[in-house]
C-alpha cells in the first residue's frame, strides 16, 4: 500500500504543478487568461474521458506497470511542458497529461480490493485516500519554490523528473496481489 500511496501522491505533483507556475507563465510569456482557461477546460474534459477508459484498461492490466507507465508519462509531459512556449503546445501537452493522469486511480483501486478483505477495506481506503492530500500539500511548496528560484519552467520540469523516477520505481516495487510477494 505504501508504494501505491506514494505513487498516487506524486500523480498530484504532475497534475497540480501548473497551478503554481501559472502566474509566472502569464508574466513571462504574456499569455492571456483565456489561454489558461482553455488549457484547464481541455485538461478536465480529457481527464474525464481518460478516467473511464483507464478503468476499462486497468481491469485488464497489471497495476504495477499500468500505474508506473502512467506516472512516467505524466512526468515526461511535465518536462516537455516546461520546455515549451506556444499556447498550442501547452494545450496539447496538458491534454496528454490529463489522459495519463487517468491512469493513477484504477490500479490503486484494484490493488486495495485485492490486498484487503471487505472487513479491512474501509480503514485502508481511508488511510490511502490521504495520498492525494499529501501530494496536493507538497506540490505548492516544491513547484512554487523551484519556480521562485529557477523560473516557472523548472517548476514543471522538477516535478516531472520526480514523477519519472517514482513511476519507474513503481514498475519494480508495486505488487498487484499478495501472492506476487512470494
Annotated model-derived regions:
Residues 3-33, 54:
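Extracytoplasmic
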Residues 49-88:
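Conserved MFS/SLC helix-loop-helix module at the cytosolic interface between two early adjacent transmembrane helices
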Amino acid at each position: 500500500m505504501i508504494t501505491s500511496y506514494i505513487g498516487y501522491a506524486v500523480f498530484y505533483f504532475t497534475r497540480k504543478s501548473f497551478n503554481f507556475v501559472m502566474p509566472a507563465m502569464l508574466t513571462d510569456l504574456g499569455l492571456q487568461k483565456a489561454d489558461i482557461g482553455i488549457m484547464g477546460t481541455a485538461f478536465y474534459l480529457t481527464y474525464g474521458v481518460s478516467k473511464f477508459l483507464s478503468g476499462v484498461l486497468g481491469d485488464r492490466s497489471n497495476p504495477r506497470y499500468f500505474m508506473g507507465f502512467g506516472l512516467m508519462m505524466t512526468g515526461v509531459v511535465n518536462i516537455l511542458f516546461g520546455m515549451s512556449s506556444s499556447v498550442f503546445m501547452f494545450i496539447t501537452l496538458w491534454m496528454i497529461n490529463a489522459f495519463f493522469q487517468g491512469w493513477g486511480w484504477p490500479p490503486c483501486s484494484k490493488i486495495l480490493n485485492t490486498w484487503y478483505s471487505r472487513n479491512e477495506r474501509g480503514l485502508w481506503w481511508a488511510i490511502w485516500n490521504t495520498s492525494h492530500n499529501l501530494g496536493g500539500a507538497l506540490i505548492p511548496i516544491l513547484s512554487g519554490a523551484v519556480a521562485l528560484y529557477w523560473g516557472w519552467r523548472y517548476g514543471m520540469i522538477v516535478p516531472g523528473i520526480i514523477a519519472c523516477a517514482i513511476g519507474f520505481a513503481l514498475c519494480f516495487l508495486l505488487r498487484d496481489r499478495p501472492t506476487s510477494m512470494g
